[in-house]
Amino acid sequence: MGIEEGATKVSRQFTATCFRMEQRPATAAGTITLGGDLTVNRMGFGAMRLTGEGIWGPPDDRAEAIRVLRRAVELGVNFIDTADSYGPHVAEEIIAEALHPYPDGLVIATKGGFERPGPGKWATNGRPDYLRRQLEGSLRRLRLDRIDLYQLHRIDPKVPANEQFDALRGFQREGLVRHVGLSEVTGAEVERARGVVPIVSVQNRYNVSDRQWDEVVELCEREGLAFIPWFPLSAGDLDEAGPLARIARRRRASVYQVALAWLLARSPVMLVIPGTSSVAHLEQNIAAAELRLSADDLAELAAVV
């Protein structure tokens, strides 16, 4: 059974209770401000799953993908994360189809820096000319004049890092990009980039049992940057005898909801972006914004690593 399919009857009951209490449950996560001028709810949405298998091609059900995006906004989501490479291009096109003209306050973040040779295949490309083509394509597909948050998907080891950072700074000066973020970077790389271009966010893999980027979370806290965790649940966390499952049973929630609630509790700079291609799973994910873990719950999860 996959992560999204693991929601139990009790988790659906928890979700329904949250929706009776708060018709825009994403707001319960609180807010974070990016770059001093973009305030968003800390429960966002990640668009990677709005594509085909291997993050390639169109989704099996495009109409459902559109419903997911519209429902996310109805539930209070005002931060959507995507990338040129999701599809490629597919997720950005669906976002525009579903939501343009965009509601006031909706922030769309996208990323560049990958080529897609085929399904499930990724190759870094941080050449400035390639990044420019990707950015121009994203602007066109999203029907925007400026990207609110443009993230370097990976630092390309084949291209001097400062050339990549310089390109991002140039896009910002041209008015094509409002703010800049990084993905899968060390603390030292964040600091190096900040010497070239203002950085407002970091998107790294992070979850209850994979906390290798704790030092980056702490850096983000010190410097007022958003930390956007991807892959919020590892396969091992689904163990029915594990702490996440025990807490989920006590809380009448799903393991996935507990994992998301832990991330939100981990740090005030966390901006979570759970993704799905199903409206039902979307509602379960967003309901996690209402889930408050106790001190005992958090202590139990602190012992996972």
Features from the language model and the residues they span:
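Active-site groove signature of glycoside hydrolases
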Residues: L139-K158
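Alpha-helix N-cap and loop-to-helix initiation/capping positions
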Residues: G57-E64, V90, I94, W122-R133, ...
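N-terminal binding-site loop/beta-alpha segment at the start of enzyme catalytic domains
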Residues: G2-L106
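A short acidic, helix-capping loop that chelates divalent metal ions and anchors anionic groups
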Residues: T51-I55, E115-W122, L238-D239, H281-Q284
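Acidic (Asp/Glu)-rich catalytic clusters
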Residues: G35, A96-V107, R140-R143, R194-V196, ...
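Short, acidic/polar
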Residues: P58-A72, G126-L142, T186-R192
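A short, structured active-site edge motif that brings together acidic residues
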Residues: G105-G118, E184
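Beta/alpha (TIM)-barrel catalytic core signal, keyed to glycine-rich beta->alpha loops juxtaposed to Asp/Glu
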Residues: F14-T31, I155-V305
